[in-house]
């Protein structure tokens, strides 16, 4: 999964 789809990650999408 991409970082965008991970609840533990806060990416800039």
From Swiss-Prot:
Residues that bear Cysteine amide: 13
Disulfide bridges in this chain: 3-9, 4-13
Keyword Secreted carried by entry: yes
Keyword tags: Acetylcholine receptor inhibiting toxin, Amidation, Disulfide bond, Hydroxylation, Ion channel impairing toxin, Neurotoxin, Postsynaptic neurotoxin, Secreted, Toxin
Residues recorded with modification 4-hydroxyproline: 7
GO molecular function: acetylcholine receptor inhibitor activity; ion channel regulator activity; toxin activity
GO cellular component term, pick one: extracellular region
Cellular localisation: Secreted
Tissue expression notes: Expressed by the venom duct (at protein level).
Transcription regulation is among the record's keywords: no
Family, as annotated: Belongs to the conotoxin A superfamily.
Free-text comment about domains: The cysteine framework is I (CC-C-C). Alpha4/3 pattern.
Task performed by this protein: Acts as an inhibitor of nicotinic acetylcholine receptors (nAChR). Specifically inhibits the alpha-7 nAChRs of D.melanogaster, and seems to have no inhibitory effect on vertebrate nAChR subtypes.
Protein name: Alpha-conotoxin BruIB
């Amino acid at each position: 999964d991409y970082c965008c789809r991970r609840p533990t990650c806060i990416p800039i999408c």
